[in-house]
Amino acid sequence: MSAPAKRSSTDTQDKDLMLAADKDMEKDTWNFKSMTDDDPMDFGFGSPAKNKKNAFKLDMGFDLDGDFGSSFKMDMPDFDFSSPAKKTTKTKETSDDKPSGNSKQKKNPFAFSYDFDALDDFDLGSSPPKKGSKTTTKSMDCEEICASSKSDKSDDLDFGLDLPITRQVPSKANTDVQAKASAEKESQNYKTTDTLVVNKSKNSNQAALESMGDFEAVESPQGSRKKASQTHTMCVQPQSVDTSPLKTSCSKVEEKNEPCPSNETIAPSPLHASEIAHIAVNRETSPDIHELCRSGTKEDCPIDPENANKKMITTMESSYEKIEQTSPSISSHLCSDKIEHQQEEMGTDTQAEIQDNTKGALYNSDAGHSLTTLSGKISPGTRTSQTAKVQDLSEKLPLDPSHSMAGLDNLRAMQNKDLGLIRSRFFKKPEKPESHVLESSPIETEIQPVIRENIGSSLNPTNDTSSHEKIIHKDHSNGKTVENVAGQMDHLKLQAKNTTREKSILQINISSKLDASSLTQKLSNHLSSGVESLQKPKLNSLGRPKLGNIMADLRAVKTQRTIGGNKDQPSSAVQPEFSSSISKERNTEAPVKKSSEIHHLAPRDKTQTLHCPSSLKRKALDEDADRSLKPQLKRLSMSPRENRNVEELTHRAVQGKFSSQESRIDTKTTKEPVKESPQTKSHYQNINMANLEIPITENADNIEKAEAYTKELENICNILKKKHEEAKELLVRAVVDNNKLLMLNHPLYEDQISFL
């Protein structure tokens, strides 16, 4: 039947259905009765019509092209959405076509005929997919896909280079996808890499050892190729135990393809055996030394490829995940030319800068290969300190008569031979030199920068060793090596640059920590001799100098006297140091909080001469000229802390010096205000000012006037009392009169009033 005929037949069928529905609705309409009869509404339907030709049926096929015309077509050649042909009563089919029609009707109309197995042949490449090239078993496909996905995880790690990952040789039964993947992985196995791996935990180290052990265990008796890697490593471990264990390794890996029979084994050299044994002993005895796991041999084995691939992938994945969790790995691709260029640039550095924080030894990580080091140029002047540090490191390593002595001999032989070392651009000079000397007591470390003899000796290269050895042996009971002396020398040189800034802080700390008895004795011994000769002329000429400068001088006196009391320094050397410190601290130190701490000095002596700079003389003349115009300064009160420190400590030493001055002040009882002197102490000033009250002259005239005034006041008070009593009487009289006036309006009195 043609398309127009089909279209016309469907249109007529639709019209017939609509007409039949209209007729049924007319027959089965609701019967509305009149509301006047109060009958309920009848919503009942009539029975549906039976034996209708155009009745609606639900047993029609729900396919995409069932009731649509021929114009509705889907242009999808790859997908089969065709539905089975309908069986119509109008068309007559031959007996040959009936079996085919029945078979089509038996098919499930909801069946999706797309072949999902064709996805195995789907490829993103330019070549069209080849149908029929399926894998032998689905289990092989799943295993290979899992293996490739796991092995690709290692490529996602950002090592900065392509890590060599060995894959199994693909068999003939593998698909083209496996062949391409293995070819891509094989192309990455022939690269020379230089990596620097930093591991911060022991767990990652052990995991790496186990993973490489499993990796080395993969062997095949029929292997045709063997990939051996030569690794040259150097273990780096900082000496500080407080920080987290850090393992730094610089390894150069060279991949080589050597045809060799699979059953051949490589005999390890004696050097390698001794070093490996030494490493094992160090691993057991000293936990601070960490070794880099050696990368074992990697082999291609065609027999039993699945187990080998699984082991390789799991071990590599576990090691890389742990490395990624602990610390980011830094790696670079370096050639031999770049390494030589870096040696020339880094050649001026000393070996002590790298071995300053290292424990361990250089060892060969692969069996049967000679150990090579990259020699750097080192100045001959630094070899003595380097050898001393190497010996110090060798003493710290655990000693075993069978294994560790051989490893130490190898280490010394390698380091004495041109002092070779591995250099890389990742090893850089530390910004600040590290000191290995333990901190001494707080008082000793604070006093050392103040003494100028120690600072001068630290700056003088001739007597460095003698002076610093004395300091170190005083601070610590045990002897120190040359390395500790060098570290202390660097530490003191850095401190010598900031002496002016550190002086004030150290002096304040020392003055607060000094013993009260020692300070009192030293002040009483030296105030009369050296301090008075310097302080009296200044106070005489300046009158009232700035309290900040005097405070600085007094604090310098306290510090230098306590330091000068030591047995090591003679008393004669204290006086020039005291004068120089006063002249320097007056220019450098800021003025301190004003207080009357300096009042415990001796009284003025007018006969002494003035020894001060010209600037101070000029200030003194200006102050003397303007003294008559300026008001007198107020007495400054001290803080509670200074009252405790100064008054209690210097009370005994200064008590005798103020006896004469107290008697002199007590005799002067005049109306004039008592002048304050900077020599008197605030404590005694308060007592004297309380006792020295100015007497008031008793005047008879004033007393008589006061008595007369008191009498007058008493008289006025008496008069006021009398007036008050009189006022009360008047009030009573007024009340009585008012009552009488009110009684006049009473009716008893009206008759009497009317007669009048």
Swiss-Prot record:
Residues 1-20, 81-109, 121-157, 170-269, 562-644, 656-681 are annotated as: Disordered. Keywords: Coiled coil. It comes from the Eukaryota. Residues 189-208, 230-251, 562-582 have a biased composition (Polar residues). Residues 8-20, 90-99, 583-608, 619-629, 663-675 have a biased composition (Basic and acidic residues). Residues 125-139 have a biased composition (Low complexity). The keyword Coiled coil applies. InterPro entries: At4g18490-like. Disulfide bonds: none annotated. Residues 701-741 form a coiled coil. PANTHER family: BNAA03G58330D PROTEIN, OS01G0755100 PROTEIN. This is Uncharacterized protein At4g18490. It comes from Arabidopsis thaliana. The lineage of its organism: Eukaryota, Viridiplantae, Streptophyta, Embryophyta, Tracheophyta.
